Amino acid sequence: MVKRLSNRMVFKDKAPLEVDVIVFSAGIRPQDELARQAELEVGERGGIVINNQCQTSDENIYAIGECALWGQKIFGLVAPGYTMARTTADVLTGMPSEGFK
């Protein structure tokens, strides 16, 4: 728990810290070990490379969500994962699909 007071923060343990600015950053690291073992293409910094249909470098294997790398981007949000899931479902069932964008 952090409490903000003008140019000072006071942490839960009551320790103060004088600040001009606070930057908070969080990130994700894709879990792609299985893809590496399967010799699928993965990005330099991780993530299973997919195309617009969410296919990996093996056209019979799909990847969606935080493990997927599309356009050199990893999406740490749930909404892109839902869109990838819809795209994959459409492709697998032969439905028209604009692909993941």
PLM segments and residue spans:
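FAD-site-proximal beta/loop scaffold in flavoenzymes
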Residues: 2-10, 15-90
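A short alpha-helix-loop-beta-strand transition element characteristic
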Residues: 41-45, 95-101
